[in-house]
């Protein structure tokens, strides 16, 4: 089974719209949608391959990390931009921090900077980088 993160017609979206700022995280009700999605993916019972074509950020990083393998197009970007608005990626970091060294995880979680596909492969976040046409 393949989990596609992003596609040529635009990016798929998982999680809150960060354009709204921290207001999306300030409600009285806890957000449980991502947790339910993560449990479903984790418990699916078949090998999963993430195909990343575009931006893989925020909740998309968590979903990708739940997959057994990850392949990215050479133009893909990865990151946790919620850090830029003062939100720590608490839900997402649980799923990817074991894949990479602690300092690499801290860099992603604290800076909110995006990294390219080759850097993501270098730090162990993904397995392969391929030309977009081969994805």
What residues fall within each predicted segment?
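Crotonase-fold acyl-CoA enzyme core
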Residues: 39-135
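Conserved hydrophobic packing residues within short motifs/helices of P-loop NTPase cores
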Residues: 2-4, 49
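Short, Asp-centered acidic motifs that coordinate Mg2+ and/or phosphate
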Residues: 1-2, 69
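Glycine- (often His-adjacent) and acidic-residue-rich active-site loop
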Residues: 6-40
């Amino acid at each position: 089974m393949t989990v596609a993160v992003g596609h040529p017609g635009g990016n798929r979206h998982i999680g809150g719209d960060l354009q709204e700022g921290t207001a999306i995280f300030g409600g009285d009700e806890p957000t449980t949608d991502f947790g339910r999605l993560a449990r479903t993916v984790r418990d699916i019972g078949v090998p999963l391959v993430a195909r990343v074509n575009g931006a893989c950020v925020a909740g998309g990083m968590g979903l990708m990390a739940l997959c057994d393998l990850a392949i990215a197009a050479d133009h893909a970007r990865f990151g946790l931009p919620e850090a830029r608005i003062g939100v720590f990626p608490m839900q997402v970091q649980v799923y990817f921090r074991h894949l990479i060294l602690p300092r690499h995880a801290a860099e992603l979680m604290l800076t909110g900077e995006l990294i390219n596909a080759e850097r993501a492969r270098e730090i162990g976040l993904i397995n392969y980088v391929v030309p977009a046409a081969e994805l």
